[in-house]
Amino acid sequence: MTKEFHHVTVLLHETVDMLDIKPNGIYVDATLGGSGHSAYLLSKLSEQGHLYCFDQDQKAIDNAQVTLKSYIDKGQVTFIKDNFRHLKARLTALGVDEIDGILYDLGVSSPQLDERERGFSYNQDAPLDMRMDRQAPLTAYDVVNTYPFNDLVKIFFKYGEDKFSKQIARKIEQARAIKPIETTTELAELIKAAKPAKELKKKGHPAKQIFQAIRIEVNDELGAADESIQDAMELLALDGRISVITFHSLEDRLTKQLFKEASTVDVPKGLPFIPEDMKPTFELVSRKPILPSQEELAANNRAHSAKLRVAKKIRK
């Protein structure tokens, strides 16, 4: 891993081991990031196995080309710079219509958080950006300065689950009428000013939920995850597995719902048997989400909210 792209991988062994790797299999890392999961997965493949890695951040791919060089030299890795919502189309274009396993590590990678100018962090002063893909048109600046009041309230409440969404949106509306809100610090101060004093004494940064909401909106994170996970489940071969790491309740709820729909069947009462086309196509590998160990939590503070869910395809 290069110094410029330092990232501590969360739930490394659990995420990959639960995929039950076949040495000659075809696998996908939908969220390359710091390439930790990819490196561990590749170590389990034979030279006949192959890994396709997606990331919309060129820096992640540049870093992986250094850290995974030995596997690249053997022709075991293909990098795809794109949003994982286009996963099915991009794999199909490469002649891949079936995979043995796929993993997702959702959310923002450490290097993106730590790179001040990306504007993801409320702890560092930077221009309001928050784009995972630096070529994408919509920025956090656009959301904060151009979205109507009602739209701000909606995304703050829906994606940030912040009960002071209206007050924060009103404070933003008042401030931007005087001059544009340009930096993360300006925005964080406005959020603080909109909240009651007793709220500011609570654990955690008062701007955390609103920054999350804006980031999700800028990158359409939930829409992309929904599309991509459904496509991935279609692409999986029989006995293929999918591992998904989430970092907040919205992502976890989405993953849990998609897995539940595929692993349960809703049949009318009194039906003597379940028709073949109504039987579940997946089963849950673990009934409850897998959480980081105490050792991992002690070593990596960013692992605290991580949850891993795994499902296996049992019927085509």
Swiss-Prot record:
Catalytic activity: cytidine(1402) in 16S rRNA + S-adenosyl-L-methionine = N(4)-methylcytidine(1402) in 16S rRNA + S-adenosyl-L-homocysteine + H(+)
Family membership noted in the UniProt record: Belongs to the methyltransferase superfamily. RsmH family.
Localization per Swiss-Prot or TrEMBL: Cytoplasm
Pfam families: Methyltransf_5
GO biological process: rRNA base methylation
Its biological purpose: Specifically methylates the N4 position of cytidine in position 1402 (C1402) of 16S rRNA.
Gene3D superfamilies tied to this protein: Putative methyltransferase TM0872, insert domain, Vaccinia Virus protein VP39
Keywords, alphabetical: Cytoplasm, Methyltransferase, rRNA processing, S-adenosyl-L-methionine, Transferase
InterPro entries reported in the protein's UniProt record: RsmH, SAM-dep_MeTrfase_MraW_recog, SAM-dependent_MTases_sf
PANTHER family in the record: 12S RRNA N4-METHYLCYTIDINE METHYLTRANSFERASE (PTHR11265:SF0), S-ADENOSYL-METHYLTRANSFERASE MRAW (PTHR11265)
Lineage of the species this protein comes from: Bacteria, Bacillati, Bacillota, Bacilli, Lactobacillales
Identification of the protein by name: Ribosomal RNA small subunit methyltransferase H
Organism of derivation: Streptococcus dysgalactiae subsp. equisimilis (strain GGS_124)
Single GO term (MF): rRNA (cytosine-N4-)-methyltransferase activity
GO cellular component, one term: cytoplasm
EC number in record: 2.1.1.199
Highest rank taxon of the organism: Bacteria
Residues the record lists as binding S-adenosyl-L-methionine: S35, G36, H37, D55, F84, D105, Q112
Predominant subcellular localization, coarse grouping: cytoplasm
